[in-house]
């Protein structure tokens, strides 16, 4: 059914072909509905009038009321002049300044007339001024209708073509007045609206663009944010419910001799309570008859690999094979080494398949895999190639999930008669509200404690001028037999940046530490060169590894005890935490040194303080989300389960995310097949919102 909101934006009074082109190209606004959902990013209270004597240069946008006393002109060049209007409210004087548009100014603003002036006060030559302010003639205003003024994001192109926030505001107000009452269809159930004390969808649209008070803004935002989050959650849970019905999983009902022998003889230490809890959750999944789709979160060193191995042993005890995919060859080798060390002489065959495995060795692995003679295959993307066939793949473990595309994981499905159980591991802590939105279709397990005896990493902030003590500390650590990472933000010198670069830094460090062996690793090296340099460090052949952030994920060198991050202000919290996680893997005390200049923004200082204050990855992830925002909700578009969030903010709307989740769960619990007529309003609206039918969520 065609709605008034489907009308082309060109047919809105005040738009026309030229503005239509700008709106569509710059803001992706094509219809009335698109404009209605282009929400303001902030509001200013226009009911408050300040006296000129009250102004200060640290004020945000304010307004004053008064009369123009006189105009003055100051030449800036042969063809340009600055126009200044001296403006008074009877008690003080402020200057209104324009650097262009003199003809328009003299035509529209008159000496002696009363105006309301709106802008940001600044000080110039000892006097307050408003540069290019908004001015309204008091005689033209309905003062009783002045309320909250919305502000809309615009692009540089729009500003150059005269379409700033005020122009968008005029269009939205025209739109709101043109839409007949009752023309906007409700998208939530009346019972839900009443129970949650929400305003109607129509009221919310009107008030979000044309509020009379702060209460109008808040009630409109709550309604529209909740609606957005509710449909994201409803879609996620609908997919998950459909997946549980459609895709049967292998039932791993027994714990057999391999698992029991490993647990009794080979387990290197007692499991933490968190590991035990996660194993129970995984066991419940594997014997449920449904395919497991579980995200396993755990900070660096929390014991995720051991949990993954025990999970794979359960599959082997039940007559199945297992695989583990890692994003790089060196990580695959580390997993292979770790798993073999755990298993010792147990009758479990573990092999590795990467792009480097070629010739007869590769043929042998592929043959034995298809025959069922290999129990666990560790590898990289090579595992998902068409030539790789398992006899019966029961579980796939994917390490560091963000390095694999969804389509790549989908190829795992072709490796077995039924879809294998999926366990996705990540050492990147994901805040609860974000996980609920991006990975909401996965069950989430968290290992939130480290094995006993592990010493917390000491994080210290140092300034650029403290490098002598820094280098002395590094020298002492290396002499005691430890290894050190030194991370640079850049590979080579940049004309536009005074940041330290790796190439120059490596040469200087070789001069500072002539008695030690250094490796260097960066993203422009050939993969084989990078792997070789990394392997030297892993094997202890070099003591100092000079690198960019390519060492951010997964590398395990227990002997490395110092992480130095230069120009640490250039890195986000999550990245700093991941880099820090390269150390602290052995029994010795480890250190992370964040080196910066003295001039730091308040946000950078917050990041540094948080890093020095805590090693808790989940606290850091929550803080990072609040400081940085969720960006584009990494993965939501390719996952096919979430929609663009136009007003909700995952970082700041955590309570609404949880509320939306709870309400969506109630609907799914009552109508898992999405067929009850009492919910047809919801299912029809969800169908309109969905932009893909690919069930990526079933693959995680």
Q: Where would I find each of the regions flagged by the language model?
A:
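Long, highly charged, low-complexity intrinsically disordered interaction regions
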Residues: 1-13, 25, 232, 242
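OB-fold nucleic-acid-binding modules
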Residues: 38-65
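Upstream accessory/linker segments immediately N-terminal to the RecA-like ATPase cores of bacterial MutS
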Residues: 74-266, 670
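Accessory helical-bundle/CTD segments and flexible terminal tails appended to RecA-like ATPase motors
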Residues: 515, 534-544, 551-558, 563-566, ...
């Amino acid at each position: 059914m065609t709605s008034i909101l489907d009308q082309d934006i060109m047919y809105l009074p005040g738009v026309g072909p030229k503005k239509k082109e700008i709106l569509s190209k710059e803001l992706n606004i094509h219809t009335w509905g698109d404009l209605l959902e282009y929400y303001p990013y902030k509001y200013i209270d226009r009911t408050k009038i300040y006296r000129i004597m009250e102004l200060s240069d640290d004020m945000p946008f304010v307004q004053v009321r008064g009369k123009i006393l006189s105009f003055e002109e100051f030449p800036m060049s042969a063809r340009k002049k600055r126009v200044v209007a001296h403006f008074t409210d009877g008690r003080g004087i402020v200057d209104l300044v324009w650097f262009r548009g003199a003809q328009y100014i003299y035509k529209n603003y008159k000496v002696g007339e009363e105006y309301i002036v709106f802008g940001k006060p600044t000080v110039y030559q000892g006097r307050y001024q408003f540069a290019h302010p908004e001015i309204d003639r008091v005689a033209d205003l309905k003062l009783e209708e002045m309320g909250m003024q919305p502000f809309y994001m615009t692009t540089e192109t729009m500003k150059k073509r005269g379409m700033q926030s005020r122009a968008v505001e005029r269009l939205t107000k025209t739109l709101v007045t043109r839409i007949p009452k009752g023309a906007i269809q409700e998208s939530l159930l009346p019972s839900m609206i009443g129970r949650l004390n929400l305003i109607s969808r129509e009221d919310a649209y009107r008030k979000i663009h044309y509020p009379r008070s702060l209460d109008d803004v808040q009630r409109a935002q709550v309604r529209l944010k909740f609606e957005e989050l509710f449909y994201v959650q409803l879609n996620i849970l609908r997919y998950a419910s459909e997946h549980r019905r459609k895709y049967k999983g292998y039932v791993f009902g027994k714990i057999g001799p391999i698992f029991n022998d490993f647990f009794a003889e080979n387990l290197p230490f007692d499991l933490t309570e968190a590991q035990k809890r996660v194993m129970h959750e995984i066991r419940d999944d594997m014997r449920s008859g449904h395919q497991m789709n579980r995200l396993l979160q755990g900070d660096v060193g929390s014991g995720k690999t051991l949990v993954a191995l025990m999970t794979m042993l359960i599959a082997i005890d039940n007559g199945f094979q297992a695989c583990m995919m890692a994003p790089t060859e060196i990580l695959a080798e580390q997993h292979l080494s770790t798993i073999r060390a755990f298993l010792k002489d147990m009758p479990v065959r573990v092999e590795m398949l990467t792009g480097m495995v070629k010739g007869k060795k590769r043929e042998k692995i592929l043959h034995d895999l298809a025959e069922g003679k290999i129990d666990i295959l560790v590898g990289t993307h090579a595992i998902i190639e068409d030539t790789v066939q398992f006899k019966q793949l029961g579980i796939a473990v994917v390490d560091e999930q963000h390095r694999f595309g969804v389509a790549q994981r989908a190829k795992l499905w072709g490796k077995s008669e039924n879809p294998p159980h999926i366990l996705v591991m990540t050492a990147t802590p994901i805040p609860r509200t974000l996980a609920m939105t991006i990975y909401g279709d996965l069950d989430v397990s968290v290992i939130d404690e480290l094995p006993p005896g592990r010493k917390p990493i000491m994080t210290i902030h140092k300034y650029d001028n403290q490098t002598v003590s820094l280098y002395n500390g590094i020298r002492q650590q290396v002499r005691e037999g430890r290894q050190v990472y030194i991370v640079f933000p850049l590979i080579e010198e940049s004309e536009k940046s005074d940041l330290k670069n790796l190439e120059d830094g490596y040469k200087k460090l070789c001069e500072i530490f002539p008695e030690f062996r250094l490796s260097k690793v960066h993203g422009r090296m050939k993969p084989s060169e990078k792997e070789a340099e990394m392997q030297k460090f892993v094997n202890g052949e070099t003591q100092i590894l000079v690198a960019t952030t390519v060492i951010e994920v997964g590398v395990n060198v227990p002997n490395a005890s110092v992480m130095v991050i230069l120009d640490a202000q250039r890195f986000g919290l999550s990245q700093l935490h991941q880099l820090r996680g390269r150390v602290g893997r052995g029994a010795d005390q480890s250190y992370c040194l964040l080196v910066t200049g003295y001039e730091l923004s308040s946000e950078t200082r917050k990041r540094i303080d948080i890093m020095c204050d805590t090693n808790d990855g989940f606290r850091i992830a929550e803080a990072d989300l609040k400081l940085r925002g969720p960006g584009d909700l990494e993965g939501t578009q390719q996952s096919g389960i979430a929609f663009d969030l136009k007003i909700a903010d995952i970082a700041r709307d955590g309570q609404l995310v949880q509320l939306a989740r709870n309400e969506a769960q109630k609907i799914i619990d009552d109508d898992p097949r999405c067929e009850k007529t009492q919910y047809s309003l919801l299912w029809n609206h969800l169908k309109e919102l969905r932009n893909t039918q690919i069930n990526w969520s079933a693959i995680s």
